[in-house]
């Protein structure tokens, strides 16, 4: 992979978009590398993924305007489909994905961050959907995920105006979960990833599936999804391990060791 690098730290995998001279902008090659990187994740051992951009200036500054400027209608639709296919794969990936947003997250960068389960950003992060100022619409799910995260009114304001917002405003409107100083971003993201990775992985994956599937369903159908996933946990070793440790009378209580079974 020319534009994406990976590193495994215990049960956490860090996937880094590595195109800093272009502020990690997305083009077809970067999107293809992202797809390969996620497909290569060892889902038996990795329990949380951190997605970030190389350097301290940009998570992803957007799609590559140079490569888009000469696209035909058919090429634009194909590029949009490529981005959406990759982002949907990330959104529905069984393992939780945290976006460590270390600078610009504009256009496709904001759309990529929104495809992740959790967004943690540095205090120099900037978010926005500037596409209408370039004569196009968001193409990688921006009109859809932004409304689901921050509400329709705020999403329309940001998309129609093409205005960028800083980290504190992104936190206020619920676009990001937390903000840290740039130098402390990865430390805190990895700390959260480690906490997620310590929990029963089958249960965590089922929670992701329940939330993602249920959000678009009527509540009576959504709770049916949850109850089936809840029930399926009772045939796992991890459920027996977790409850046995909780009920143990030993002092100190033993810590559950989850085996993904």
Positions of predicted regions on the chain:
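C-terminal alpha-helix plus adjacent terminal tail
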Residues: 1-10, 41-44, 56, 162-168, ...
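Conserved CoA-thioester-binding segment of acyl-CoA-metabolizing enzymes
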Residues: 1-52, 88
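Charged catalytic carboxylate motif
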Residues: 29-33, 82, 89, 188, ...
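Hydrophobic alpha-helical membrane-association signature
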Residues: 30-33, 79-82, 112, 185, ...
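Glycine- (often His-adjacent) and acidic-residue-rich active-site loop
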Residues: 53-89, 105, 135, 218
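Crotonase-fold acyl-CoA enzyme core
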Residues: 89-202, 232-236, 241-244, 260
């Amino acid at each position: 992979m020319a534009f994406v690098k990976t590193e495994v730290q215990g049960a956490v995998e860090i996937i880094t978009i590595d195109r800093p001279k272009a502020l990690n902008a997305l083009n077809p090659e970067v999107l293809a590398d992202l797809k390969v990187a996620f497909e290569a994740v060892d889902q038996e051992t990795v329990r949380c993924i951190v997605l970030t951009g190389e350097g301290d200036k940009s998570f992803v500054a957007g799609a590559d305007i140079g490569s888009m400027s000469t696209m035909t209608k058919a090429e634009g639709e194909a590029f949009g489909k490529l981005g959406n296919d990759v982002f949907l794969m990330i959104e529905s990936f069984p393992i939780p994905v945290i976006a460590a947003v270390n600078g610009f997250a504009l256009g496709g960068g904001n759309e990529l961050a929104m495809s992740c389960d959790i967004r943690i950003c540095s205090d120099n992060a900037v978010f926005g959907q500037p596409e209408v100022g370039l004569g196009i619409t968001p193409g990688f799910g921006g009109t859809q995920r932004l409304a689901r995260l921050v509400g329709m009114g705020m999403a329309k304001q940001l998309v129609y105006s093409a205005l960028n917002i800083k980290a504190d405003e992104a936190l206020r409107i619920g676009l990001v979960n937390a903000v840290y100083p740039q130098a402390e971003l990865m430390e805190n993201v990895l700390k959260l990833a480690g906490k997620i990775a310590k929990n029963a992985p089958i249960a965590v994956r089922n929670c992701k599936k329940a939330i993602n599937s249920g959000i678009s369903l009527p509540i009576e159908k959504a709770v049916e999804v949850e109850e089936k996933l809840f029930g399926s946990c009772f045939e796992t070793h991890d459920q027996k391990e977790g409850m046995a440790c909780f009920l143990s009378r030993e002092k100190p209580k033993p810590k559950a060791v989850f085996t993904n079974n």
